[in-house]
């Protein structure tokens, strides 16, 4: 049913002020070192005209991976486009970080590690973080090469990367002990590692950080947890429950709950963190069919509502394990685990991306670390060429227009009307709205209280378009990698938001 929205900006109640670094991103450790990551889709698979064949799971996770050379963090285009996003947290972590050896003296990598980080690679990464005005966050190694499960974790490797980063003028300002400790088997941890071993070692690590790098913020546990995600504090079931899966990827992969990992720890977290994806991509759909959403569901209420529901579910965990009422950080987020859906690099992903940012900010203060900046199909920039994808321009517009004070929009979330309201990012009096029309067929009408600037986003020829239109003009880089002008158009009276359209309205 077509929706009609009447904007009433002068009557809205503020909800909270949010972290100006709400929109941040991941650079996977395996990108820095070079290594395996998710296999790229074919052009036909991205277009939706070719099916993704199920991998041969008898070969393990490697059946879904391919080799990638190290990312060039000195690339001028990469630095320019990342800098345009403004100040962000840059998280260097991921599954591969747990088995990465910091070979800063050039002596080579011993047994028990998997990825090999050279000094110059880390120097380049730190220079990148400084060049883009970012803040550095990492997780550290915790594998057989460092210690066995019955031996306590030791800081011999962590000290190297903390000290080098500080020497380079790019201190590690936030840290998680390890990445996704809910999956203790077959992801890099010492053989036979248990939740009790994790609790022991996390306490050792956190105490060590506080004693030696007291300015560093301690974040954790960086996990997924189906128990936490199934029902929120008000008793509402997860939106995916109707489809037979209460927590998608988390339900299939979480071997330890948040309680298993945290109950009994003596070192309290500064900030509570978790990971969240909208299920799994086509790469893992055959293994986890109930966690996969087909393209036809990418604008459904269940699909779009899952991010805010998950944030509400974790509020009580934040209050228990970190600062009550404090920030929550989603230290990995994206459209789908296992590298993103086939449509992750297209306009269709803009709807989910903007909806997640808007809805998360209505639930809590915090930071969302998008996975990734420039790797795999869910990257904001295309791997290798660093061409900006539609979602890059979408988050760039959010940062340009939406301020850090969040208001209750006064509009119930419903098909055709996902409405979010903030103050203006330019500091001028007024409000900035985002209206997402997640209907496939019906146009949404918006009644304006006065003249406004309109920034209407649509696909360039369809939802799976590789490029996006702003007020009918294609967004792409110009000569010398110049950004396109991101200008609004004046409107008054009423405007229409096309099916699948996302429109920013600045009053």
Indicate where each model-derived feature is located.
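Histidine-centered active-site/metal-ligand motif
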Residues: 180, 275-277
